[in-house]
From Swiss-Prot:
Residues that bear 2-oxobutanoic acid: 27
Organism encoding this protein: Staphylococcus epidermidis
Role description: Lanthionine-containing peptide antibiotic (lantibiotic) active on Gram-positive bacteria. The bactericidal activity of lantibiotics is based on depolarization of energized bacterial cytoplasmic membranes, initiated by the formation of aqueous transmembrane pores.
In-chain residues carrying the UniProt-annotated modification 2,3-didehydrobutyrine: 42, 46
Gene: pepA
GO molecular function, one term: signaling receptor binding
Protein name: Lantibiotic Pep5
Modification after translation (UniProt): Maturation of lantibiotics involves the enzymatic conversion of Thr, and Ser into dehydrated AA and the formation of thioether bonds with cysteine. This is followed by membrane translocation and cleavage of the modified precursor. After proteolysis of the propeptide, the N-terminal 2,3-didehydrobutyrine hydrolyzes to 2-oxobutanoic acid, possibly spontaneously.
Cross-link (Lanthionine (Ser-Cys)): 35-39, 52-59
Residue location of crosslink Beta-methyllanthionine (Thr-Cys): 50-53
Length: 60
């Protein structure tokens, strides 16, 4: 049973290090750029809504 537990612990450590290695090189800039590219339609609609809101209601 001790051998099985040690192998299980090693697998957890391996997965944790892999996840960390994948996430560390990324910065907020590329992630934001990618999300903007995926959501351009939503962003355009939001901008139009904001402009129309300011024009009609005088929202601050």
């Amino acid at each position: 049973m001790k051998n099985n537990k040690n192998l299980f612990d090693l697998e957890i450590k391996k997965e944790t290090s892999q996840n960390t290695d994948e996430l560390e090189p990324q910065t907020a800039g590329p992630a934001i750029r990618a999300s903007v590219k995926q959501c351009q339609k939503t962003l355009k609609a939001t901008r139009l809504f904001t402009v129309s809101c300011k024009g009609k209601n005088g929202c601050k």
